[in-house]
């Protein structure tokens, strides 16, 4: 027996013929190959296609095929390459390429080839690729006797990742060992993916390409030769933010590294968010270079000398741009790895066991970088299958733009409609001008002598001649006919149809018509005379209030609203609406309706729509309509959110695409939509981050150049175009922002929007929504303390407003919770106790004192409320500029209680004008509730010194002086209030009361008359006036006042009817008194009332 041949260890393993598993299917039906041949016989040479994909040990070859007409080879290639599953199989495929060659079948020489690098799509869930037409590159050299290919082109090529699952219950090992059945008997191949659905949707793939690394250190090639070629240089990259490391191994041969070379790795969805944030924040990208020896028995003592780092900021900058997938960096210098301080991603060097031979005899000193000494430079590129930082997609436009929902109104004045009288007057003017020209034509020349002028009968003769000529020429008839037509039109317009009328009635009609026509003729002739004399008539006064009066009415309305007099505030706003073409007037009335709440919310939206119809670019109205629509969409009908979206897009167009505030408003709208608009919200946040980075860079550049930031740095802060959006204070908007961290400007934009929604528009829930977005920013943990303080203050104010809106015990419960020791409100209030306190913290502490006072008032703790109100006012002196104090109003107050020392200190402060009107009113009300009218008057006077034009403060001071029985100061304060607001009915009423107590009955009568005419409706004040009349014995005047109270103001009050009845009884007016007593009998609700009624009835019977 012949001995068995020794098996060839290098022989490739046989092809895997298992018909079940994962397959890469390649389809190539035909190709057109043009050969460079001289005769037809050579043109019929057979060729075949070979395919080689990662994992193939031997390229697969198709059947030999002869060409058909036109050099078309019908290869009909459909080849299924079985590959292993799992991540190892996927990494093998994506790090390789499909190689296609057209070979000469006789010699197997390569005629043309192509490389298809499309297997990488399998990493992100793509399982098919195809192309119509694939050009192959002809081979430059072929063996002798083999024709060259001039061109080669595949008609079609496709790659598909498929799977044929095992039959249920089948034995995988037995099926793999058995001969494969025919293809027709096998189950069909199904689409397959190496990655899960989530990874296919959100995963990514990274590719690191090393383009070059040169020059090499001098001893590197010698070390590679000593290691027998088993030495390689590895370039690795640890992606910022986490994720797998990417390492490319480069062989060393011929004095250079084998480049370019690449390596691809999978990026799971879990690490992409951190990678995105790292690229957006510009975290450094550091490449690591190291040398490894894999030869057995050899060590590398110079490992640290070849261990280097290369910083690549261009990679981070390029890939940090939105939508970028690839970035390259060239000329990267290498330095010692130990000096870089970066975290290594390549495996550490481990010396082999035993006594290995060093691959390089010379060991460099510690800290030496041989790459740096050689001047080596690295060139790499980094590519992702999908953008790590998503491409910014602008939010889609709203279904209907706002200009379509609210079309702009044409304010061009329209000419008044013409009437028959106007046409008649126009005819008269035309005829008058024509007659004037005729008369002018017959007049003698100016330089004619008296005899010449008297010739022909003089003026009378010329007049007769003119009449004759007008009749002869027919001009008179034309004038008469034209007037006749106008008169007929006038009669038809004015008298319609006369019907059957008597001669007397017709005579009256003719007389009226004649009078009308004569008046029209005189009016027309007078207009002609006035125009000729250049003395036009003065236009009638405009019925619309001017700007100054509109401002005065707005201030008075705000004062009435602060006092709780909503009826008068509504009346004053309605008077301002006489300026119906002023968008700002409609906007301010809409904000008032929003603050009123309830049924007024619908009217507020109508006002904002009217303002936008008048002025489509009114930013305040746009933001107000946005807020109203968001509130309605969240609480009632989500369809309102479409209107809010349209308003937000319009605001973005008006404010400019670089306005952070406008983008913040749009983000609030998308946040109100919820998950339905999550992608749009992310788009807004992405654009805001880009704008912030741009503005911070511009501000930093300006600061480094010693130039103040341009206005665009704070663009969008002010309301503009009609106001309505208050500008953020410099201390809260831009101070420290340049040096601040990322996210600072974005957070400030949301906080500014929240303040506007809260304070100007009374929309606390929507303000809380904006604050949620601020706290949800990615960089919120790193924002500065001032921004956090502003956010906490706005949140506390929103919480307080929501509790007030809830009503009932919610306000008291919220006050208790906010006043808990350690709460954010108390912490902010005490934040100004140190020495180095920022202006923002000081402002917040001052504002929190007022908030704490209001919270104590809400929970019924009057004493505590007074203490913090006084503290709020007192702190104004600590931060006030040194300005001379206003003169204190007379008279000087008596010694105050202990807390009053703060008011005395604040009196000389120039910042008292910043104290809101509500604080003065609430503090005075707290004193009045304790029965300390004199101290309440002091508060009113101090407030009036800070706001000398505020009528309600003077009126409050006068009222408190009346309560303290100081009539002189009361009269002075009330007179000042009356001058500032002559239409305030309560000021007139209190003036009447003071006059009565001082014995000035005539002045009291006039003041009371004016007060009643202006709508005096305070029953208590009127009853006090009636009591003064009673004390003075003026029963008739008392009766008038009591009738006003009993009939108009308190028609359901039994006591008012009884007072009126007693007054009438005192005047012996039995019948009227009986009616009043009868009405009181019907209104009597308890025994005391019935007893009083019975007493009066008995008295009336005694009168009878």
UniProtKB/Swiss-Prot annotation:
Family of this protein: Belongs to the CFAP70 family.
Start-end of Gly residues biased regions: 716-725
Protein name, per record: Cilia- and flagella-associated protein 70
Cytoplasm listed as a keyword: yes
UniProt TPR repeat ranges: 583-618, 846-879, 917-950
UniProt signal peptide: none
Name of the gene: CFAP70
InterPro entries: CFAP70, TPR-like_helical_dom_sf
Organism: Chlamydomonas reinhardtii (Chlamydomonas smithii)
Subcellular location(s) of the protein: Cytoplasm, Cytoskeleton, Cilium axoneme; Cell projection, Cilium
Record's function text: Axoneme-binding protein that acts as a regulatory component of the outer dynein arm and regulates ciliary motility.
